[in-house]
Regions:
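Active-site/substrate-binding loop(s) of hydrolase catalytic cores
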Residues: 1-134, 141-145
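Hard-cation-handling environments
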Residues: 148-200
């Protein structure tokens, strides 16, 4: 999974860029918020690999009480996972950027990034809104420089709702970033170019 590779790169990669990051940035990594749920999803995929059910979701909740909705519990903190992470974010470390890595992106894309679509909640400080868009623009530029197509922005997420892992940080004067990557399973997919959305 991506977080394991990221942790290794931050700790061991000797590129000039990563050395500079290590010297100037404190990075906290939560490898997975719901390890039991990850195991359920992985086991279901492996069990059904090569069958008509290969790209389906498990027929059970992958969190005993809330299923996937533990990622919508960031303002109520009903679940131990969100309670513990928010304690770290808002009472112990106070990070400048909170990055919430999700999957899956819209079916024909590789990653969705900020800037986000309108509307923006008027309770969010304009400097936070601008900073989120600035980080998204830097991400887009880097994808272009690395010749990595498939990134989209200004799509289906807004900055209005205030209950997600990306949006609650706004009210603590932190930059909240959410990306959605790939699709729901590791199985490669082909998307017919004729069926992709056309630009105007």
């Amino acid at each position: 999974q991506m977080t394991s590779e990221l942790a290794w790169r931050v700790a061991a990669e000797e590129s000039e860029e990563m050395q500079k990051i290590r010297e100037n940035v404190i990075t906290l990594i939560v490898p997975v918020m719901n390890p039991d749920g990850l195991d359920i999803v992985v086991d279901w995929y492996r069990k059904n690999l090569g069958t008509p059910f290969e790209n389906t979701s498990p027929p059970i909740l992958y969190q005993k009480y809330v299923g996937h909705d533990n990622n919508r519990d960031w303002f109520m903190n009903n679940m131990p996972e969100t309670y513990n992470v928010t304690k770290i974010l808002y009472n112990e470390w106070y990070p400048q950027i909170v990055y919430n890595h999700h999957q899956s992106s819209p079916s024909w894309t590789k990653i969705s990034i900020p800037p986000y679509a309108d509307p923006v909640n008027p309770k969010i400080h304009p400097a936070i809104t601008a900073a989120v868009s600035e980080v998204g623009s830097a991400m887009s530029k880097r994808f272009s420089l690395e010749n990595m197509p498939g990134a989209i922005a200004d799509n289906f997420y807004t900055m209005f709702w205030n209950g997600g892992g990306r949006t609650v940080p706004y009210y603590h004067n932190m930059i909240g970033i959410l990306t959605e990557t790939g699709h729901t399973t590791p199985t490669p997919r082909f998307y017919d170019p004729e069926k992709l959305p056309k630009t105007v």
